[in-house]
């Protein structure tokens, strides 16, 4: 199949006009055959995207809003993995139904597109791919209506068809928030444990629980400064229910700062069958790429207009994809592959606690919270391994290997994930030894980056963080990596080798020896998130063992040696890190969540010597501005040659360097 078909450019124009007419007349509600997993696909809106803006050869885009109803047979082995599916209410055919919100962004004329379907797994209902790949600011990245919402136009300029499918059944469906309406097990109750770090001093502190409280009298709360401390119930600590979901925690007057860890336990009621979210993504993507009926809004000239599918997700959504693969959902109910490629972004070695009763899909255990949370358990990596800690043999690709439905995988992480999300477990075995990734897997660490930064951010402060926050946006390398993923799938062109710290290379080390220098203004204490194995069958989980966790080796500027090193690290004007300690008064023995730090270099040798800074000053590094700009251009050319930067991004970054804005310090 050609990468970008250019023939039959108007073959589907009549069909597109007919679809618009149907929508304008009211609602397009079409029913698929009964044996299909998607039994109803209801288009509620089909309008021009980006205010009719056109994108070169691809032309204009349509924004389609729909609702997809899936119908699952609990007896099908491919569905049997879904927790509580057998307990859910059934329809007349004995199947269990759920309905997902769907948004599709497709070329006006599908034949002008690239043939690639990019499924951006919603993050708490939101669209994040446009923000990362297109530098599109929120809320425009979530709306896709105004001309500027397309940002740089990278994705649409390539002719990509983008899809979002609501999968999260514990959030409401709302404008700008895609969700799944799943069955609820009325009257079922169970114990739930949640953790809160408030990072403010208001007292009492409000909090929202994941599930409805069955018995407000059973609500209890404990406090400790960090997770490894003993739980305490000091004088003045209490919790009360304001309604079924909202509570208020009264905090002790002394003994704990604003970053203390509060653990709330209660009996919850009426769980939803959350695991159906995995099936919703599986079945809708399989339907869109393979169904040839008029029901499918991606059909062109009687056949689907997409030829390959890539699953992409940021943070929570990246963890979703790792679980999706591990649970076997990359095989549809006809035994076919769903995604040809997967790109989990900033997931680290984590998964998620979704496919269980009273799961918490939105929970992200952050330092100093529970390192043994049910989402963060073995297996951590793609290869199948024996785990001496849990006694299990497993791997994220175990099930897809058995069914021959494994995708090509490109996991990308910020540097923050190697400090906060145990990313070293991707490339070590449970004993801490070097581990090679499978040949169909690549891993890339975007060195010097926080978990996620908005495009256009500059140096700033957060009250609860000790250091200025790192503003580095990962868009440029991520655009290059998406292009290489498409080439890998469409043309068989191997992507660059993995670029991550590794034990065998000496770039993945114990935290105590990672920093070779003492840098004023960049205090290093080796803080990172541990990995524990715990018994969750008891109300207060009991730790049974730990896995070795390593961190990136740093250079004398305090920056990671390995990984995909952005131009800001190769030709630096400051130190950029993936970690940022909490400030005094906010739990300083822990990391501030999701952030890195940036500490500018001194202007001259005299200034740095006076402050005791061992890092060469700007004047010592670059003879003048012209030398700095030339160094940036040279580094950009090298990154393009390695396929880690696109030519147009190389030019844009060089222009920013010339304007004094590449470092994002102002």
Where are each of the predicted segments found?
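Short, Lys/Arg-enriched N-terminal segments with co-localized hydrophobic residues
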Residues: 1-17
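Sec/Tat signal peptide C-region and signal peptidase I cleavage site
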Residues: 32-36
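Generic alpha-helical structural signal
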Residues: 5-10, 25, 548-550
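Bacterial N-terminal signal peptides
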Residues: 25-31
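Sec-dependent signal peptide recognition
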Residues: 19-25
């Amino acid at each position: 199949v050609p990468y970008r078909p250019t023939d039959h450019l108007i073959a589907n124009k009549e069909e597109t006009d007919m679809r618009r007419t149907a929508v304008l007349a009211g609602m397009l509600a079409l029913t698929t055959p009964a044996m299909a997993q998607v039994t109803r696909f209801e288009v509620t809106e089909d309008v021009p995207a980006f205010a009719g803006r056109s994108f070169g050869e691809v032309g204009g885009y349509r924004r389609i809003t729909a609702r997809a109803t899936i119908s699952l047979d609990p007896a099908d082995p491919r569905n049997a993995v879904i927790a509580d599916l057998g307990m859910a209410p059934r329809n007349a055919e004995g199947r269990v139904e759920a309905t997902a919100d769907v948004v599709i962004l497709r070329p006006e004329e599908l034949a002008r597109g690239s043939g690639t379907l990019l499924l951006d797994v919603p993050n708490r209902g939101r669209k994040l791919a446009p923000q990362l790949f297109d530098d599109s600011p929120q809320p425009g990245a979530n709306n896709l209506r105004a001309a500027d919402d397309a940002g740089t136009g990278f994705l649409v300029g390539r002719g990509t068809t983008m899809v979002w499918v609501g999968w999260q059944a514990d959030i409401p469906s709302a404008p700008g928030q895609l969700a799944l309406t799943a069955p609820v097990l009325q009257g079922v109750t169970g114990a739930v444990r949640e953790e809160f770090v408030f990072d403010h001093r208001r007292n009492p502190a409000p909090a929202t629980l994941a599930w409805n409280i069955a018995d407000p009298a059973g609500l209890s709360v404990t406090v400790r400064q960090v997770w490894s401390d003993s739980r305490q119930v000091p004088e003045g600590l209490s919790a009360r229910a304001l309604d079924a979901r909202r509570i208020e925690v009264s905090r002790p007057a002394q003994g704990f700062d604003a970053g203390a860890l509060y653990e709330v336990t209660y009996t919850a009621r009426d769980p939803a069958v959350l695991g159906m979210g995995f099936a919703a993504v599986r079945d809708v993507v399989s339907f869109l790429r393979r169904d040839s009926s008029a029901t499918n809004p991606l059909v062109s000239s009687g056949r689907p207009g997409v030829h390959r599918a890539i699953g992409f997700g940021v943070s929570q959504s990246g963890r979703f994809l790792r679980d999706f693969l591990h649970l076997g959902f990359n095989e549809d109910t006809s035994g076919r592959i769903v995604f040809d490629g997967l790109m989990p972004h900033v997931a680290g070695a984590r998964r998620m606690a979704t496919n269980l009763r009273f799961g918490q899909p939105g929970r992200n255990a952050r330092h100093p919270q529970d390192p043994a949370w049910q989402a963060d358990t073995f297996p951590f990596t793609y290869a199948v391994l024996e785990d001496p800690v849990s006694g299990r043999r497993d791997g994220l690709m175990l099930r897809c290997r058995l069914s021959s439905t494994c995708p090509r995988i490109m996991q990308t992480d910020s540097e923050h994930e190697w400090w906060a999300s145990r990313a070293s477990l991707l490339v070590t075995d449970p004993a801490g030894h070097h581990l090679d990734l499978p040949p169909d897997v690549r891993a890339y660490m975007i060195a010097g980056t926080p978990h996620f930064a908005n495009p256009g951010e500059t140096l700033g402060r957060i009250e609860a963080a000790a250091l200025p926050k790192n503003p580095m946006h990962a868009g440029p390398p991520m655009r290059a990596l998406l292009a290489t993923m498409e080439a890998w799938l469409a043309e068989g062109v191997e992507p660059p080798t993995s670029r991550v710290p590794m034990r065998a290379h000496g770039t993945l080390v114990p935290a105590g020896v990672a920093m070779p220098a003492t840098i004023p203004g960049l205090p290093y204490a080796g803080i990172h998130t541990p990995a524990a194995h715990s018994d969750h069958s008891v109300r207060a989980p009991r730790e049974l063992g730990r896995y070795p966790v390593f961190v990136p080796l740093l250079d004398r500027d305090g920056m990671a040696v390995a990984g995909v090193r952005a131009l800001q690290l190769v030709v630096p004007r400051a130190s950029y890190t993936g970690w940022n300690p909490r400030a005094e008064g906010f739990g300083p023995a822990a990391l501030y969540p999701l952030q890195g730090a940036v500490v500018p270099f001194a202007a001259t040798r005299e200034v740095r010597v006076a402050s005791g800074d061992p890092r060469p000053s700007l004047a010592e590094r670059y003879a003048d501005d012209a030398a700095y700009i030339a160094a940036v251009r040279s580094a950009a050319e090298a990154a393009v040659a390695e396929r880690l930067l696109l030519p147009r991004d190389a030019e844009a970054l060089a222009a920013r360097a010339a304007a004094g804005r590449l470092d994002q310090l102002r």
